[in-house]
């Protein structure tokens, strides 16, 4: 029997792309791998192959049992795994809240929150943890307000999301889904009461979903709960990691912050380069081939599982020359950090707004920001769908 390697984790490599993924992309771009939950799959690491899988042609996220893995099927994961028209219909219910125009209208509020959190950081005095004071609370409060949850609940919502994104042989943490699902159910009742008293159906995302369920019958209550949780988790953890790891990237390239202060037009490209180069999602959604497909010459048969690595694809030298280098002037930069095709990240515009706001404000307010500990002593969270810095002590 051929040897099957374990999936390499960026958490074991100081948040950087594991060297094994670089090697596989160059030498064995479609290879067998054992995932953290024990399943084996084809690991796809080249840009064009990853883009092909993400396009959806010949692949599906909707896995039949037992291919879906331990405790990963059923109602909780239904909205994550949908494909085709059902997926587009559910996505359409909330897409208006995430358009570039709608998100741009949130700019003053995101700036206000960022300023307030940096005030708290400065009051704490150096050394202070940028994760605890800024990177964690900002996306949590923003997504809570967008969804229609009390901002004061952001800490416990973050803890639930941390549990539901853990991966391993036990599969999905069903108790976390149940607890969070009960919370969403209670909040949905509050939104229903608001609607009965003349509230606007588009007041927030959860109210929109309650209206679509009650008045239009466009989704089941289980789908309402599941979709709410998926949006919440997606808006919390990935942006938290991108903020903290993005600040670390800038501090690790000391010439770049001064460059960005001198030329603010480079801020947008710098955000895109951080998104390209920094691993944020450890494990992308696993898919299954629905027909025989060749990827980089390797035959993937119908029914076989495929695990893509967007992180490896975003370093592909065929698309990104000198891909390991951090280059804020890189153009073009067609990274896949937000996915591709029908499942392109719904919250991409929101994530970009938060990242641009945080980085620009830090650059102006804390020009002398630096790490308060050696970079090699920083701890990264493993065993989750998303990567994450546990803390980022900084001084100024």
Question: What is the role of each PLM region?
Answer:
Residues 1-396:
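Cytochrome P450
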């Amino acid at each position: 029997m051929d040897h099957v390697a374990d999936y390499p984790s960026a958490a074991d490599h100081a948040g950087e792309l594991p060297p094994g993924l670089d090697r596989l992309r160059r030498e064995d771009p479609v290879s067998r791998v054992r995932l953290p939950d024990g399943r084996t799959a084809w690991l796809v690491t080249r840009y064009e192959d990853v883009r092909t899988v993400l396009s959806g042609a010949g692949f599906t996220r909707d896995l039949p049992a037992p291919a879906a893995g331990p405790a990963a099927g059923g109602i909780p994961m239904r909205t994550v795994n949908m494909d085709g028209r059902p997926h587009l219909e559910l996505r359409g219910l909330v897409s208006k809240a995430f358009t570039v125009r709608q998100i741009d209208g949130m700019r003053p509020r995101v700036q206000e929150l960022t300023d307030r959190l940096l005030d708290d950081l400065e009051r704490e005095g150096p050394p202070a943890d940028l994760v605890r004071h800024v990177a964690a609370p900002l996306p949590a409060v923003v997504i809570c307000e967008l969804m229609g949850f009390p901002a004061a609940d952001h800490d416990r919502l973050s803890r639930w999301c941390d549990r539901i994104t853990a991966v391993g042989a036990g599969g999905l943490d069903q108790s976390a889904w149940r607890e969070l699902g009960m919370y969403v159910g209670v909040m949905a009742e509050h939104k229903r009461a608001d609607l009965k008293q003349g509230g606007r159906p588009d007041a927030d995302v959860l109210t929109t979903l309650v209206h679509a369920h009650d008045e239009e019958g466009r989704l089941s209550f289980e789908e309402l709960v599941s979709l709410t949780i998926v949006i919440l988790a997606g808006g919390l953890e990935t942006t938290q990691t991108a903020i903290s790891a993005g600040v670390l990237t800038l501090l690790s390239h000391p010439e770049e912050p001064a460059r960005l202060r001198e030329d603010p037009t480079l801020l947008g490209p710098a955000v895109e380069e951080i998104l390209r180069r920094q691993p944020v999602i450890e494990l992308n959604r696993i898919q299954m081939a629905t027909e025989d497909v060749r990827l980089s010459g390797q035959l993937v048969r119908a029914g076989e599982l495929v695990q893509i690595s967007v992180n490896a694809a975003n370093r592909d030298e065929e698309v990104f020359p000198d891909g390991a280098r951090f280059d804020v002037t890189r153009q073009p930069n067609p990274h896949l950090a937000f996915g591709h095709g029908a499942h392109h990240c719904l919250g991409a515009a929101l994530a970009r707004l938060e990242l641009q706001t945080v980085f620009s404000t830090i650059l102006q307010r804390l020009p002398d920001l630096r790490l308060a500990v050696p970079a090699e002593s920083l701890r990264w969270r493993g065993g989750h769908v998303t990567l994450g810095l546990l803390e980022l002590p900084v001084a100024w």
